[in-house]
């Protein structure tokens, strides 16, 4: 949704805004860098404004921030217990960042940073590395019990352990791909339909009549994309809470 180029993939192109290179290393400031900073700034400003003047009868902004707080807190408590609340700052930051980034990308000419696999994979790796680091810090070598389910017959225990290890280290892949693929597919679909409408209108009166149905579809898909933007942030947060439970309670 970031341009009117005929190619629906063009909107995901990474472009340099400020060229910076040191030796053979490229440190250029890109459109992705800009929208990452914009997402952080907008999230921070919204949370600051909504929480700076708290009222007994909450404003709309205060209600939204309190709902986000309660959602993350309750999800974390249900998944990892009271001990899991120490991860609240991380989980809340991830939820707000992904949600705001997804919503920003729905506006014309704005870039969707969550449609870049490098961004979503970085967020997923942050979660998994936190699980591993905190798990070993809290339990030491006992964290490895995560890969040895209790009650499994000795004969098949090695096989089950291998499956558990593969499953654990595939988490960042599935977590990142889910968010990346949904945002990418949705924006490509919108671009295709909007491009079709422009092409139909260019045909004249008959084309205008034929563009009504695609226009209705585009509006419906746009509304659906707002829902998907929230759901993907929701799913990422829920799965993050479930994974962080392994750092607190590694035993099956």
Curated annotation (Swiss-Prot):
Gene3D superfamilies: ATP synthase, F0 complex, subunit A (1.20.120.220)
Main location, first listed in the record: membrane
Membrane topology: Multi-pass membrane protein
Subunit structure: F-type ATPases have 2 components, CF(1) - the catalytic core - and CF(0) - the membrane proton channel. CF(1) has five subunits: alpha(3), beta(3), gamma(1), delta(1), epsilon(1). CF(0) has three main subunits: a(1), b(2) and c(9-12). The alpha and beta chains form an alternating ring which encloses part of the gamma chain. CF(1) is attached to CF(0) by a central stalk formed by the gamma and epsilon chains, while a peripheral stalk is formed by the delta and b chains.
UniProt-recorded name of the protein: ATP synthase subunit a
Compartment(s) of residence: Cell inner membrane
Biological function: Key component of the proton channel; it plays a direct role in the translocation of protons across the membrane.
Gene Ontology CC, one term: proton-transporting ATP synthase complex
Family statement drawn from the similarity comment of this UniProt entry: Belongs to the ATPase A chain family.
């Amino acid at each position: 949704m970031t341009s009117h180029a005929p190619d629906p993939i063009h909107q995901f192109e990474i472009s340099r805004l400020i060229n910076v290179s040191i030796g053979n290393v490229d440190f250029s400031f890109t459109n992705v860098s800009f929208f990452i900073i914009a997402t952080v700034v907008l999230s921070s400003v919204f949370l600051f404004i909504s929480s700076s003047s708290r009222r007994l009868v909450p404003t709309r902004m205060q209600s939204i921030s309190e709902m986000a707080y309660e959602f993350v807190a309750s999800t974390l408590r249900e998944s990892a217990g009271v001990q899991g609340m120490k991860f609240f700052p991380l989980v809340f930051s991830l939820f707000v960042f992904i949600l705001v980034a997804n919503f920003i990308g729905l506006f014309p000419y704005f870039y969707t940073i969550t449609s870049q696999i490098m961004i979503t994979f970085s967020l997923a790796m942050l979660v998994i590395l936190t699980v591993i680091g905190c798990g070993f810090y809290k339990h030491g070598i006992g964290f490895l019990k995560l890969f040895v389910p209790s009650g499994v017959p000795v004969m098949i225990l090695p096989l089950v352990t291998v499956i558990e290890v593969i499953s654990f280290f595939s988490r960042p892949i599935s977590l990142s791909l889910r968010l990346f693929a949904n945002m990418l597919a949705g924006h490509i679909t919108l671009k295709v339909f909007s491009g079709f409408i422009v092409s139909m209108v260019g045909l004249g009166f008959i084309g205008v009549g034929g563009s009504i149905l695609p226009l209705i579809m585009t509006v419906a898909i746009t509304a659906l994309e707002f829902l998907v933007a929230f759901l993907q942030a929701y799913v990422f947060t829920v799965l993050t809470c479930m994974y962080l439970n392994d750092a607190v309670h590694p035993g099956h």
